[in-house]
Amino acid sequence: MPRRSILSAAERESLLALPDSKDDLIRHYTFNDTDLSIIRQRRGPANRLGFAVQLCYLRFPGVILGVDELPFPPLLKPVADQPKVGVESWNEYGQREQTRREHLSELQTVFGFRPFTMSHYRQAVQMLTELAMQTDKGIVLASALIGHLRRQSVILPALNAVERASAEAITRANRRIYDALAEPLADAHRRRLDDLLKRRDNGKTTWLAWLRQSPAKPNSRHMLEHIERLKAWQALDLPTGIERLVHQNRLLKIAREGGQMTPADLAKFEPQRRYATLVALATEGMATVTDEIIDLHDRILGKLFNAAKNKHQQQFQASGKAINAKVRLYGRIGQALIDAKQSGRDAFAAIEAVMSWDSFAESVTEAQKLAQPGGFGFLHRIGESYATLRRYAPEFLAVLKLRAAPAAKNVLDAIEVLRGMNTDNARKLPADAPTGFIKPRWQKLVMTDAGIDRAYYELCALSELKNSLRSGDIWVQGSRQFKDFEDYLVPPEKFTSLKQSSELPLAVATGCEQYLHERLTLLEAQLATVNRMAAANDLPDAIITESGLKITPLDAAVPDTAQALIDQTAMVLPHVKITELLLEVDEWTGFTRHFTHLKSGDLAKDKNLLLTTILADAINLGLTKMAESCPGTTYAKLAWLQAWHTRDETYSTALAELVNAQFRHPFAGHWGDGTTSSSDEQNFRTASKAKSTGHINPKYGSSPGRTFYTHISDQYAPFHTKVVNVGLRDSTYVLDDLLYHESDLRIEEHYTDTAGFTDHVFALMHLLGFRFAPRIRDLGDTKLYIPKGDAAYDALKPMIGGTLNIKHVRAHWDEILRLATSIKQGTVTASLMLRKLGSYPRQNGLAVALRELGRVERTLFILDWLQGVELRRRVHAGLNKGEARNALARAVFFNRLGEIRDRSFEQQRYRASGLNLVTAAIVLWNTVYLERAAHALRGNGHAVDDSLLQYLSPLGWEHINLTGDYLWRSSAKIGAGKFRPLRPLQPA
């Protein structure tokens, strides 16, 4: 049987942990009348209490309380109170071992508890094997088994038996998964898969290593190379649907494990496992390369459009003087002609009085050269880049397997025409080429007097293909990011079942009429209230006039007395090196235990080495430089540990450990209760090898960059971060982190800046149970939408933008609920859906319906904002915390000029995760020592007003040494449960 450990010490402890909250104690240990009747049949208070406690332990956690074990203290009193006996009676219980045995036997007989037998073990392995086909996480399997045994009233065996059954189930499931992926393969498939482990013709890399490389730059050369990779993956010609034979979680896990292994390691696997691993790598690799090719096309087109736009603007600016001179000249000529008309003089003589006829004719020619096309746009300049697109467009269109929804059929028809022309080497478009997809701004360029312009037709088709791929109207077989919109959602039959059984995981009434009645009734009441207040000039610190809305800025939030306390606590915080800080925080929380080995699940053998790799990510130093700065380590050791122990899920669970510690720390309660949060973006320039992976956003200048989008709780804990494209709005990612973080925070209200909101976000936030509160710049320009009806809101007229079109919501209500359910259940991420909805053409029904729903919620929010200074202050304070956290992150991420230089997106994600983990550790460490500083100030005669503690911040770093050699030993000896000394206090 498998011997390896699949549970950590903390996980083993959690499996049999007894509840300590009042609600859980009541839920698990409340007796009914029958229970109490049986308990009271025991003779004497000691026997009654002992019998009752044994019953409680058998029910939950499902074990027998040992002879020498004492009951869990929080459990004893509520149990003793029910049969009305004193807790001190426990000391007299079980003095005769026979009594305990008799009670245990009677409990089994009366309440149906059964001992765990070999038959139960075999059933457990069989049951767990089915679950292990979906996940190989030991804690999930062990928890499922224990829950099953409790429901069956089977007394739990020793945890070793639970772990052994779980491990055996994983082993069996692995064999079944390997067989499921390997059995459909023919000999030809196996030969082609084995060839992936051989070296390419150039001898430098294996085929597998080359196929898994990411594109270097968004240009036609790298696009063609990447298309060759996709062709190579497609040439494997794996059996159709093989990737659906096993659960996606397991397929991804096998692919990740295979990706960390060398070809030599893979070649040593027994055949079934080797072929299964290569199939997983192939299916994931094909999807990744497909998505990267589409992204390259998107970015190449973006570059060409930006270049055309810039050239257009530069040329216009360069010709500004000449245009001005011509305007002034023709102004004089025009005036001369007007005067000639009025006086009856010859018009030609009037012109020649201003300038000679030859000069006039020459000026007209110059004016024609200066003149821009009728639409005054830049699109005509795209034609200058046609050759760039032609280098890869034929191969690009040929390699992708495209399908289209009816809305994009014209685009796909145009693509088919271009494919046919490329195959036949035809230059002229057929007379019946589809033109319905051509937008008005392209019309004059494509449809010329001489017929359809081939170059602009193809440019227009490729541009519309990009837009249709973004919206999901065209999808790609084998892609992950560009699948059919339907494939992202929960299946219709599952949604119908959930709705009929009232089990939709949404925070609103799921009946359309009930929902609309509740929201529109509230909206009408709020509109009437705010209209009345505005008319009477009673809005707090706000006024609405004919010219619009004016809101008085908030006063400074930090009083002078608080600043004095801030300065005092900062002066006594201990000086600490970042290495010492991380060791100390790990001593408190054990966050490093979450960085388990990808394959075995074992903990890292060298914790200091693990912390070194995390710190290398956080301070942006990289493994090579970190090995030089950390005596006793090498690049090879760090690289191995990073490959096997640091990944997205280990960073995520370790971060949750720190966030939970902050959440439960009493001092953090001065800043909030963990129910509100804010999010903000932070831009980092890309340089060196990473420059080509960055995106340009004019907001941050002309340099390419990456954005780390981070959510922070009201207690300053950064509970999630994500690397996102600079060019996308913050609003795209707001929901992801609220839904998919792993901490115990229960966020109810969330704040963002202006870029963080759209109507779609407002709608989904409400459906999923979050109060959305963005700080909207130029709020007066953000319009209110009112229900149709006779009600007039004259005082709000400058802010009203129109009426709500509720019929769209009614028509698409089930689609809205299905979308929200899919996002909530994690079938698809909110960011992916918001990107697609934002790219839809305006007439798309679901996008319009969700927008109307969002307008209701946005209007309600603005009305609340106008009525409440406290809401404004709360949002402002929440966003200030995020901005202050960004300053700390910038200070930590100081190496390499604060630039991202990793080409791989995976490495960029690890940089963001490491940075967020270390900032969370700094926040927790500062919180602990700020509490100690406040106590020390009080103990030395300083008056510390509790109401001022909310103004302290755990985001300071002046006392933390972030530079130098990174040595993992503490300069101060700190005993278990002890803390390092504060700096000397100034006398009161």
UniProtKB/Swiss-Prot annotation:
Keywords: DNA recombination, DNA-binding, Transposable element, Transposition. Residues 674-695 have a biased composition (Polar residues). The keyword Cell membrane does not apply. GO terms for molecular function: DNA binding; transposase activity. GO terms for biological process: DNA transposition. Tn21 is a transposon encoding resistance to sulfonamide, streptomycin, and mercuric ion. NCBIfam families: transpos_Tn3. Required for transposition of transposon Tn21. This is Transposase for transposon Tn21.
